[in-house]
Structures are given as structure tokens and as C-alpha cells.
UniProtKB/Swiss-Prot annotation:
This is Elongation factor Tu. PANTHER family: ELONGATION FACTOR TU, MITOCHONDRIAL, ELONGATION FACTOR TU-RELATED. The keyword Iron does not apply. Gene3D superfamilies: P-loop containing nucleotide triphosphate hydrolases, Translation factors. It is found in: Cytoplasm. It catalyses: GTP + H2O = GDP + phosphate + H(+). It comes from Streptococcus pyogenes serotype M49 (strain NZ131). Its EC number is 3.6.5.3.
Length: 398
């Protein structure tokens, strides 16, 4: 059989399974792939068993070792990439490094236990890193005889979600058994199909990177005699065309406006540069010393420079090449945003004396220069050129 081309006709969505250890995240992932392969056989829908998902290869993302399984499958209307992080620490690292961007997630809660500490932590992290759409799968319902108990567990989950600003009263809760579905029990297979149609309907199609406002982190700047100043870098999101008005944001106190007079890639003139392209942008009315690496070129008004923010961070363990000792309040490392390092001081949350290598923690940061940041911007924490932590902006403060 000839190899099929990757079909772009279906919208692509990234999702994942989250929840407490042993509540059935990986079993559910296996059940989804297996039931879809039985009910909707296509070249994409191949059954994956628990063992193959559980034996996720180690990946390194920004210097951090993470185990994550990636599986793909499709429904009638969409193509999905699904991530399953086996260990709790892997999940935390995944969320904080932005290694696995999720458009939505399935929160798996065992009906036999109800919400547990990691259930809460995963909901909080989803809120912090901007995963806006959660669907609940109450697993192991075949092991609970009491209908009232199931209702209580559902109420408890909904209350917990509301506590973290998710629409707890309205979001979908599906009750089933991943193991029974995997074993081929048709009643529970139907529930997996119901879960997938809920995912299709409830998790909105993500905005494509090219539809978002322009953001181009500046990597290099040079001047061309007689033509002006060129800034180069990879377009993070959005598009850029000749005659577009842009802003140069970050590092300097004021944001400068300019007009694009040329877009080049591989020394060829382009009509427009798109997200993902490495381009050189010719700017009118900008002197060579008015723009530098670490600033961003952006659509006017779309992103602002800030010095104070809250961040959710993971501090590398000694084994990952991180620090060997804890750090304390007012620790002053470098924060690496996109293309540059900026010194900043860290304020720890009340009641936290110190942070150990391998911990994750919410911190307040104050940078010495303003940088173009927004909720969801990722950064590394560095000391003497080596990475000691990784983080994501959860809230802008000033």
C-alpha cells in the first residue's frame, strides 16, 4: 500500500490527558486509540497498547529531561496529537517548559478516589499556563456500585474546577471505564466515542499562528548603506508585509514605531513573511542603534514591555545539570527571553524559605529592563550561562 500523504484537510488540535497518578491517564490514551481503530479504521488510527505509551522516550527540552508519549489519531472531523506524561514530575515539566502546547485537555479522575492532590495541582497548572478548555473523564465507574457516590464525586470535581476559574458547572463530564473499553466491552466503547465527539465539539479549533498578531524576536541587526536598517529573526507568529506599520518593543524605555519597506528570505524579496519563516525586515526611519537583539518587532498595541510578573517555574535537579544547592528570597539570576538575557530578582511566596533543585514554585520576578512579555511567554533561568530553571509567565504585574 502506498504511503498516505499527511492530510491537511482536517483541522489539527493538540490535546493531552492530565490527572492524579494511577487514575488511568495512560489507559484512557490507549483506549482512545484502540476504540477509534476499531470504530473508525483509517491509516492514522492505529491501536496503541498501555506498554507502548508508558515506555515514552526521554526528551530534552531546554535542558530538562522529560518523558512524554505522543500519539496521533483522528475523528470524522479532526486530526489530534495527544500527549500523555506518565509521571507527575514529567507533567509539571511539560507544562512549564511549554514542551507540549495543549489546546485542551482531558482531566482523568478515578471515581473510586475522587479528586486527589495532583488533580488539584494539574488544574492549577492548566490555569497558570493558559490551557483554557478541560473535559472531565470520570474513570473506573464500573468499580462503583453506588450511583449517589458517583454524583458526589462529580460535584466535588466541578467545585474544584470552579475554584480555579474553570466553568465547573458547565464543562462536560463523561463517566466511563477506560479498561473496559480497552477490553472491548461495547457499552464502554460507546462512551469513548461519546468522549471523542465531546472533545470535537467542546475544545475550539486553535487560532492558526499566521492569524495571530505579528511577533518577531530580533536576533541580529545590520545596516545596508543607502537602504536603511535590517532586523532579522524567525517570525514567532503572525505575518509581515511591505508597508506594514510595526512597533519595536522591549529593553528601551520607549516603544518605537516604524514602517516595513522590505521583507527578505534567503536573499530573495518576499511579498510577505509568515510564522516560522527566518526573515530580514528592512525598516524605514530606524537608526542602527535604535534596535537591538532581544527586542521584538510586533503589530502595534499587541504586546507591551513589562518588568514585573508572576511566573510558574521548575528548577532543574542536580542530575539535570542544575544547581546543587537551594536558592533563597532575592536570588538574582538571568532570565533568558527568546533571544536575550536580562537580570532579575526573585521574590518567593509567603511561607517558602527556599527552593530546592527539582522543585516547582510560583515566583514574583522584577527585571532590570522591560521586556516584551505576556501570559504564556516562556523563559529560562540562567546562571553563568547555564540553565538552572525554566518557567512560564502566569500573570503580568507591571
Amino acid at each position: 500500500m502506498a504511503k498516505e500523504k499527511y492530510d491537511r484537510s482536517k483541522p489539527h488540535v493538540n490535546i493531552g490527558t492530565i490527572g492524579h497518578v494511577d487514575h488511568g491517564k495512560t489507559t484512557l490514551t490507549a483506549a482512545i486509540t484502540t476504540v477509534l481503530a476499531r470504530r473508525l479504521p483509517t491509516s492514522v488510527n492505529q491501536p496503541k497498547d498501555y506498554a507502548s505509551i508508558d515506555a515514552a522516550p526521554e526528551e530534552r527540552e531546554r535542558g530538562i529531561t522529560i518523558n512524554t508519549a505522543h500519539v496521533e489519531y483522528e475523528t470524522e472531523t479532526r486530526h489530534y496529537a495527544h500527549i500523555d506524561a506518565p509521571g507527575h514530575a514529567d507533567y509539571v515539566k511539560n507544562m512549564i517548559t511549554g514542551a507540549a502546547q495543549m489546546d485542551g485537555a482531558i482531566l482523568v479522575v478515578a471515581s473510586t478516589d475522587g479528586p486527589m492532590p495532583q488533580t488539584r495541582e494539574h488544574i492549577l497548572l492548566s490555569r497558570q499556563v493558559g490551557v483554557k478548555h478541560l473535559i472531565v473523564f470520570m474513570n473506573k465507574v464500573d468499580l462503583v456500585d453506588d450511583e449517589e457516590l458517583l454524583e458526589l464525586v462529580e460535584m466535588e470535581i466541578r467545585d474544584l474546577l470552579s475554584e480555579y476559574d474553570f466553568p465547573g458547572d458547565d464543562l462536560p463530564v463523561i463517566q466511563g471505564s477506560a479498561l473496559k473499553a480497552l477490553e472491548g466491552d461495547s457499552k464502554y466503547e460507546d462512551i469513548i466515542m461519546e468522549l471523542m465527539s465531546t472533545v470535537d465539539e467542546y475544545i475550539p479549533e486553535p487560532e492558526r499562528d499566521t492569524d495571530k498578531p505579528l511577533l518577531l524576536p530580533v536576533e541580529d541587526v545590520f545596516s545596508i548603506t543607502g537602504r536603511g536598517t535590517v532586523a532579522s529573526g524567525r517570525i514567532d507568529r503572525g505575518t509581515v508585509r511591505v508597508n506594514d506599520e510595526i512597533e519595536i518593543v522591549g529593553i528601551k524605555e520607549e516603544t518605537k514605531k516604524a514602517v516595513v519597506t522590505g521583507v527578505e528570505m534567503f536573499r530573495k524579496q518576499l511579498d510577505e513573511g509568515l510564522a516560522g519563516d527566518n526573515v530580514g525586515i528592512l525598516l524605514r526611519g530606524v537608526q542602527r542603534d535604535e534596535i537591538e537583539r532581544g527586542q521584538v518587532i510586533a503589530k502595534p498595541g499587541s504586546i507591551n514591555p513589562h518588568t514585573k510578573f508572576k511566573g510558574e517555574v521548575y528548577i532543574l535537579s542536580k542530575d539535570e545539570g542544575g544547581r546543587h544547592t537551594p536558592f533563597f528570597n532575592n536570588y538574582r539570576p538571568q532570565f533568558y527571553f527568546r533571544t536575550t538575557d536580562v537580570t532579575g530578582s526573585i521574590e518567593l511566596p509567603a511561607g517558602t524559605e527556599m527552593v530546592m533543585p527539582g522543585d516547582n514554585v510560583t515566583i514574583n520576578v522584577e527585571l532590570i529592563h522591560p521586556i516584551a512579555v505576556e501570559q504564556g511567554t516562556t523563559f529560562s533561568i540562567r546562571e553563568g550561562g547555564r540553565t538552572v530553571g525554566s518557567g512560564i509567565v502566569s500573570e503580568i504585574e507591571a
